[in-house]
Amino acid sequence: MLNGNKCHILLLPCPAQGHINPILQFGKRLASHNLLTTLVNTRFLSNSTKSEPGPVNIQCISDGFDPGGMNAAPSRRAYFDRPQSRSGQKHVGLIESLRSRGRPGACFGLRPVPLWAMNVAERSGLRSVAFFTQPCAVDTIYRHVWEGRIKVPVAEPVRLPGLPPLEPSDLPCVRNGFGRVVNPDLLPLRVNQHKNLDKADMMGRNSIYELEADLLDGSRLPLPVKSIGPTVPSTYLDNRIPSDSHYGFNLYTPDTTPYLDWLDSKAPNSVIYVSFGSLSSLSPDQTNEIASGLIATNKSFIWVVRTSELAKLPANFTQENASRGLVVTWCDQLDLLAHVATGCFVTHCGWNSTMEGVALGVPMVGVPQWSDQPMNAKYVEDVWKVGVRAKTYGKDFVRGEEFKRCVEEVMDGERSGKIRENAARWCKLAKDSVSEGGSSDKCIKEFIHQCCNDSKISLV
């Protein structure tokens, strides 16, 4: 505690749903320990969403792109490189305003790690904590690129302590050794996170110690690392946070189709759930192959196809397959993964989705697209052994017959029993990690002690 008041943690996420959700859940965990938590959101996102953050206070600030948010910037790099003085002054003003209202900051949590934010923390007398929302394995690759130990584009296999043998197609950012550029700003942004890391007081990771123990034990980073995941609502894990059944922040409106009632009518472990997240955009050819693969499995399915992607579906697909399949534009993924009827999760292997699949014990079929996804899919199949990764052919997309093979392998094949057994084991470990005395629970308590029982105030 500071000056007899509650310790106050400020959270500054990257303004995207996949980054806000985990840091918001972390904030709820901190609040459950009687800490004040404030998430700093942009005006654009606050105006675009109906948030229900629960015990976390929301404070809005202008990022200079109020009408359109990050997508209104010329590029991702331009957004994150916007003038330091402008961004820093606004955050210092917010910190001073909170301080004047009796809510002095204790810790500033950042994602990613911009230098201006580190300077804000220092000027305001706050601790700074770098919050990483991707797995340690992926950031290990970025760290080696930053240090010059891995040269891009990568053409040879990569062998590093603590990591499985990696081919260029397994590496993060984009496949084929960073060769197929989906977002030209992404690699520099990810790599340059490590530029300012030595200025942070601590690192928080949305991971589980048991998932990446070798890497975490062998970390060469110049600061303490705390694994605080999985950052999934408590209802699905330890149930220690009251009424915490949803993230409380959603840029998309869930489909009104009664998909849970539909699931209730299905047998246990019989339904394929397909979702490629909030950002991935499949080509029309890939969409067609997924559709043909689903038909070929002859199994019930729910497929999330965002409104912007519906035109890519084959003509009459929804109507012709209505007897055994649903197409919805958005849904509550946790509800689907937790349902007893769900037997397989076909996923792009974004880290949040991967962690949800692990935490809820659902076997996975990985169809990675870009960023960290290929490496996450590698771990799903070869390290944690909770699913399989679909192979690509020719035009770099997954054919329908390969999709069918993977689904059948996970749900009915020779390895399906072992995959389900592994999924159940990791599910238990995930729940144990955030339960009283678990690895993540201990890390969260250590984080609180270091941030709040010190004369220096902190910023996450």
From Swiss-Prot:
Chain coiled-coil ranges: none
Pfam families given in the database record: UDPGT
Reaction(s) catalyzed by this protein? crocetin + UDP-alpha-D-glucose = beta-D-glucosyl crocetin + UDP; beta-D-glucosyl crocetin + UDP-alpha-D-glucose = bis(beta-D-glucosyl) crocetin + UDP; beta-D-gentiobiosyl crocetin + UDP-alpha-D-glucose = beta-D-gentiobiosyl beta-D-glucosyl crocetin + UDP
Enzyme Commission (EC) number: 2.4.1.271
Expression by tissue: Mainly expressed in fully developed stigmas.
Q: Does the keyword Membrane apply?
A: no
Cross-referenced CDD domains, in alphabetical order?
Answer: GT1_Gtf-like
Species for this entry: Crocus sativus
Q: Which domain of life is it from?
A: Eukaryota
Q: Which GO terms describe its molecular function?
A: quercetin 3-O-glucosyltransferase activity; quercetin 7-O-glucosyltransferase activity
Role played: Crocetin glucosyltransferase involved in the synthesis of crocin, one of the apocarotenoids responsible for the color and bitter taste of saffron.
State the family named in the UniProt similarity comment for this chain: Belongs to the UDP-glycosyltransferase family.
Looking up InterPro entries in the UniProt record yields: UDP_glucos_trans, UDP_glycos_trans_CS
Q: Which of this chain's residues are annotated to bind UDP-alpha-D-glucose?
A: 133, 333, 348, 351-353, 356, 372-373
Binding sites annotated in the UniProt record for an anthocyanidin = 19
Q: Which UniProt keywords apply?
A: Carotenoid biosynthesis, Glycosyltransferase, Transferase
Q: Name one GO biological process term.
A: carotenoid biosynthetic process
Protein name, per record: Crocetin glucosyltransferase 2
Q: Is Transferase set as a keyword in this record?
A: yes
Where along the chain is the active site annotated?
A: 19
UniProt-listed PANTHER family:
GLUCOSYL/GLUCURONOSYL TRANSFERASES, GLYCOSYLTRANSFERASE
